[in-house]
């Protein structure tokens, strides 16, 4: 496909984006909004953002959800802007400085919350700054400006949603159904690889792919939940399937690791059984039926615990999968599975990264303020706004540098494109509403196609072009104002990019170490006799951390294996029959406190000291288990955990 070619699958969304822009323009002019540009700009960003992220037409519900987040972010930003202005209107410089800190604070929060919800906080940060900068000439009009901005943005969002509904958005349900079938086959094939105990790299690749696919399925569940309330039952089942899929991965990998030391545990019966190849979910269904009969014949005690647990989880997966596909009423058996365990939310390991993002945003906004005051440029306020927008939106993404480059390319492309519209196309519409709508629809259509291709600069070009041509009724043509605005956008993006380059983010290694220590803490916390604590479901949170580790350190297999071993230890100890007595319970609490100290330690020396203390406590704990005559199901996983921590103590403590 050529660089300027148009694929059939891109046309519908391009028409949808053009419709959203035209609707927002028409409504803005009809109700004589003060700045209809904000409505048009909002409609374009809300519609195009999910398409750029998806690399194609977004699924149903994505645009609505993004619009909802934009409304929340705008209202938070407007309220914050009003509070800052009311409190500091007599000190304008201090007021702008506080706004810069507010933008940094919102970026800090957006770096810690779920990536789906971070958009609202990023928006709240620069909305307050926009309000404070815009009302500088007439501060008494602040409430009116805040209300107008909120109204225009809501109108733009409604127009984007109407355009989305008008062109029958894609449902993700069929993709979910197909992935559920395919994922079950992949889980069975992973178990086959682990029982064969072949090449470790092949197994690592297989379980790594399954972790990614399970995480992607969780993202599909979020999309399905946004799509319609009729999928509420499917959503509940998919949430449980996420845990079951992670359980299957854990049991398969533990089966592989067990054979490193005790290969005789996997009998020839099971080796021969898992030799049979499977291609479809129906093949897996038949094999599971046969496997359950084999287990019933051999007995639970003669079946390796990992295979027994794997079959139980796969059977539940199958049952819930059928319910998701049919979306029928939840029966009693399913309800028992769904009423399982409470999921635990883990503390973010990226606090240092979030603080770096805070300083990047705050310093870049302060730099923009100094640039504005030093130059006295009429478009200095535009520079500041662009800096805030770029840093607030870029910092919440994995590669902020590339996002800033995308904005630079977009603003550079917007200059000639905006010139064409401002000097040639729009003047020739001769104040005709129809011709103006057609001209902007053409812009939206072609940029909508480029956005779906994820062309570098396409998203920035769309927003920047609409921003500098300033659609108004009647249109006014002040070329110096246009040029100032266009150059202000470019300078703002360049300054933001400069700050991102200068304020280096060296938090990757620290984040990796914190993640690994959180895995250790989770494994230690599984050693408990507290019934409520044993019922807590840590598995989704642990695999979410593992997925972050994979993204932070692609190709670092030793780290992934260590993390996976800790997850396996956690699951095994969680189900282990630990003797119930006050002596062991008190020691469990002591070990959890020590593990927490390891995570929170700010220096290598303290971390090494607490980690050494944890290793000593594990030795004492093993002696206590012998005194209290704990069964091998307890002593063996504790011994393996202590051995792993001894082996990798330098990786877990040194910066």
Swiss-Prot record:
InterPro entries recorded: PHBA_efflux_AaeB/fusaric-R, PHBA_efflux_pump_AaeB
Keywords per UniProt: Cell inner membrane, Cell membrane, Membrane, Transmembrane, Transmembrane helix, Transport
Membrane topology: Multi-pass membrane protein
GO BP term (any one): carboxylic acid transport
A GO term for molecular function: transmembrane transporter activity
Domain of life from the UniProt record: Bacteria
Keyword DNA damage: no
First-listed, main subcellular location of the protein, grouped into a coarse class: membrane
Bilayer-spanning residue ranges: 13-33, 38-58, 69-89, 93-113, 121-141, 152-172, 370-390, 407-427, 431-451, 482-502
An example Gene Ontology CC term for this record: plasma membrane
Pfam families xrefs: FUSC (PF04632)
Subcellular location: Cell inner membrane
HAMAP family per UniProt: AaeB
Record's function text: Forms an efflux pump with AaeA. Could function as a metabolic relief valve, allowing to eliminate certain compounds when they accumulate to high levels in the cell.
Family statement drawn from the similarity comment of this UniProt entry: Belongs to the aromatic acid exporter ArAE (TC 2.A.85) family.
Protein name: p-hydroxybenzoic acid efflux pump subunit AaeB
